[in-house]
Amino acid sequence: MSPAAAPLTLALSKGRIFEETMPLLAEAGIEVPENPESSRKLILPTSDPGLRLIIVRASDVPTYVQYGAADLGIAGKDVLIEHAAQQSGRLYQPIDLNIAKCRLCVAVRQDFDYQAAVHQGARLRVATKYVQSAREHFAAKGVHVDIIKLYGSMELAPLVGLADAIVDLVSTGGTLRANGLAAVEDVMPISSRLIVNQAALKTRGARLQPLIDAFRRASERIA
C-alpha cells in the first residue's frame, strides 16, 4: 500500500482524552469498536477504513505527530507547551476541542502562607512536571523559584519537605484536599487541541481536511 493510500493515523492517550474524543468521532460518523482500557492493542481500527488510532502516552502524542508517525493527534495544552519548549518545529493546532478541561494551578500545604512568602520575596522550591509553564508563570509574576521536575505523585512533595509548592493539573481539587493541600493560584486553563502534522497536511490534505472539518463541526455541536 502506498503512503498516500494508507489509513490516516490519529494519536490518542488513554483515559479522559480518549473518553471525551469518542463522542466527537461518533458525531463525525466514526465508531471505535475496541476500548484501549480493556484491549492490549496499541493500534485500533475504526469503522472508517481510512482512519486508525494509535494509543500512546499523553506526553508522546505531539512527538508522534511532529515526526509523522501519526498524521494528527489530540493533546492537552499543558503537554503542547512542554513539547514546544523541548522540540524545534511547530505543530499545526487548528482546533481547540474544549475537551478534558481542567486548570493548571499552584498548590501548597494548607498551613503554608503562600502569599506572605511571595510578598517577602522568599525563594520557593516548586515541584512539577510542567517545567516550562511553571517557569513562565513565576517569571511573569517576579517570583523567585527553583524548579524540581517530578513525574508523578506531585502532592507528596510539599508533605515531605521536598518543595514549598507544586504546579499541577486540578479538576475538582479532591486529590489536593485529601492530601492537605490547597490551590492558591491559577496558572492557566487547560483543554485539549487537535494537532496536525504539517507535512501530512500538504501531502494528504485532501483526506485530512475533511476530518479536521468534521472535528470542528462535532466540537461545536457538543460544546
Swiss-Prot record:
Q: Which compartment or compartments is the protein found in?
A: Cytoplasm
The metabolic or biological pathway listed in the UniProt record of this protein is: Amino-acid biosynthesis; L-histidine biosynthesis; L-histidine from 5-phospho-alpha-D-ribose 1-diphosphate: step 1/9
Q: Which family does it belong to?
A: Belongs to the ATP phosphoribosyltransferase family. Short subfamily.
Report the principal subcellular site.
cytoplasm
| GO biological process terms on file | L-histidine biosynthetic process
Q: Tell me the enzyme class.
A: transferase
What GO terms are given for molecular function?
ATP binding; ATP phosphoribosyltransferase activity
Name used for this protein in its record: ATP phosphoribosyltransferase
Read off the domain note: Lacks the C-terminal regulatory region which is replaced by HisZ.
**Any single Gene Ontology cellular-component annotation:** cytoplasm
InterPro entries, A to Z: ATP_PRibTrfase_cat (IPR013820), ATP_PRibTrfase_CS (IPR018198), ATP_PRibTrfase_HisG (IPR001348), ATP_PRibTrfase_HisG_short (IPR024893)
List, alphabetically, the HAMAP family matched.
Answer: HisG_Short
According to UniProt, the reaction catalysed is:
1-(5-phospho-beta-D-ribosyl)-ATP + diphosphate = 5-phospho-alpha-D-ribose 1-diphosphate + ATP
Task: Give any Pfam family that matches.
Answer: HisG
The species this protein was found in: Bordetella parapertussis (strain 12822 / ATCC BAA-587 / NCTC 13253)
| Subunit relationships | Heteromultimer composed of HisG and HisZ subunits.
Quote the EC number: 2.4.2.17
Q: Which UniProt keywords apply?
A: Amino-acid biosynthesis, ATP-binding, Cytoplasm, Glycosyltransferase, Histidine biosynthesis, Nucleotide-binding, Transferase
Role of this protein: Catalyzes the condensation of ATP and 5-phosphoribose 1-diphosphate to form N'-(5'-phosphoribosyl)-ATP (PR-ATP). Has a crucial role in the pathway because the rate of histidine biosynthesis seems to be controlled primarily by regulation of HisG enzymatic activity.
